């Protein structure tokens, strides 16, 4: 199999960990007879330093043309980095949000597994750690607070910040389906987490999921 992987090393420890990940991929490709080519791309602070923006149209187009994207970390120290002197819409993390939206990466999959050898290092109660766990945590990435309208303004002499939380039924339905599809390959159990006793968005979320 021939594959082209877009590589976004990013900022901070990103280049270091991505370099090691590429070594692993190269060995996997060697063992299984694959050929991997890499396209180096800039995003986040690294892109700001070169192009003045956290994500360029060229980088997004190259990511879309890739078979996969390997990414490190984005951003730096908010107290010391000059990137955080910029307007919020031009800071490193906005590049990540734009990439998620551009690639329609709506489902963030985060496996959590407690291996037998690491039970002693687990911060959970002993009776829980002894049973172990194997979870797949899924988070919606392209709707909700991160993509709603936001503002900070002075109202009646008081500085007030607003973040708008919006979900539509299609956004909820597609991530619910992804969750059920993954569950069918595991233990066939799904837990949907919401705040339906307070939030309209959560009430819609629960209705669609059920």
What are these regions (language model features)?
Residues 1-12, 39-41:
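Generic N-terminal amphipathic, Lys/Arg-enriched alpha-helix
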Residues 6-23, 27-29, 157-210:
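Glycine-rich phosphate/diphosphate-binding loop of Rossmann-like nucleotide-binding domains
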Residues 10-12, 43, 74, 114, ...:
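Short, ordered loop/turn segments at secondary-structure junctions
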Residues 26-34, 65-68, 101-108, 114, ...:
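Generic secondary-structure signature for well-ordered alpha-helical cores
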Residues 31-57:
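N-terminal beta-loop-helix "entrance" segment that forms/cooperates
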Residues 37-41, 110, 191:
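General small-molecule cofactor/ligand-binding pocket signal
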Residues 46, 77-78, 198-200:
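Short, active-site-adjacent cap segments at secondary-structure transitions
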Residues 49-161:
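N-terminal glycine-rich phosphate/adenylate-binding segment common to multiple enzyme folds
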């Amino acid at each position: 199999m021939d594959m082209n992987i877009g590589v976004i090393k990013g900022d901070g420890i990103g280049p270091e960990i991505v370099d090691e990940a590429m070594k692993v991929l190269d060995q996997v490709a060697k063992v299984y007879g694959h050929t991997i080519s890499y396209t180096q791309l800039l995003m986040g602070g690294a892109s700001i330093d070169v192009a003045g923006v956290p994500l360029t149209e060229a980088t997004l187009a190259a990511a879309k043309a890739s078979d996969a994207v390997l990414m490190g970390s984005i951003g730096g120290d908010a107290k010391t980095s000059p990137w955080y002197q910029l307007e919020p819409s031009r800071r490193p993390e906005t590049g990540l949000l734009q990439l998620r939206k551009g690639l329609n990466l709506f489902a963030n999959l985060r496996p959590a597994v407690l291996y037998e050898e690491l039970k002693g290092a687990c911060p959970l109660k002993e009776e829980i750690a002894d049973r172990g766990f194997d979870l797949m945590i899924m988070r919606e990435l392209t709707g909700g607070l991160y993509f709603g309208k936001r503002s900070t303004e002075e109202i009646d002499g008081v500085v007030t910040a607003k973040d708008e939380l919006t979900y539509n039924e299609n956004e909820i339905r597609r991530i619910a389906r992804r969750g059920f599809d993954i569950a069918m390959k595991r233990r066939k159990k799904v837990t949907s987490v919401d705040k339906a006793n307070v939030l309209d968005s959560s009430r819609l979320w629960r209705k669609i999921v059920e």
